[in-house]
């Protein structure tokens, strides 16, 4: 649509600026965290861990539908206790395994949204990621 090329270019520039600001917010917001360990239901947030120097501990590995073994739950439980982790994270909605793990370990259950199923159409990528940042900051003990 050549007639609107100028508007598309302006929109792209605006989005790039917003994404760069979001990246800076994550870098600045996570650099003072007392914990660098991110315990999640699965490793969907590996990209986030790499980008912001966090260690990912996935309870179920990569596949969110995979059954978690007792051995893996014991391994994660040991890491949480040994590292003094205060919050583990699950996706929005009910995740019985993560809630049970949080209860057994007496830690908080935080929420991280991987944007798989957009529940609220008013929430765009930037808003969801800002909410994720706030959840991470609270759960990882950031100043």
Would you name each region that the model predicts?
Residues 1-143:
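Extracytoplasmic metal-acquisition and chelation regions
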């Amino acid at each position: 649509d050549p007639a609107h090329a100028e508007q598309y270019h302006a929109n792209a520039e605006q989005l790039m600026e917003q994404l760069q600001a979001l990246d800076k917010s994550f870098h600045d917001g996570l650099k003072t965290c007392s914990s660098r360990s991110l315990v999640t239901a699965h490793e969907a947030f590996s990209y986030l861990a790499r980008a912001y120097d966090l260690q990912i501990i996935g309870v179920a590995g990569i596949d969110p539908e995979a059954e978690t073994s007792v051995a893996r739950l014991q391994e994660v439980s040991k890491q949480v206790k040994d590292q003094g982790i205060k919050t583990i994270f699950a996706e929005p909605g009910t995740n019985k395994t993560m809630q049970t793990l949080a209860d057994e370990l007496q830690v908080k259950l935080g929420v991280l949204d991987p944007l798989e199923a957009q529940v609220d159409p008013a929430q765009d990528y930037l808003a969801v990621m800002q909410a994720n940042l706030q959840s991470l900051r609270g759960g990882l003990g950031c100043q």
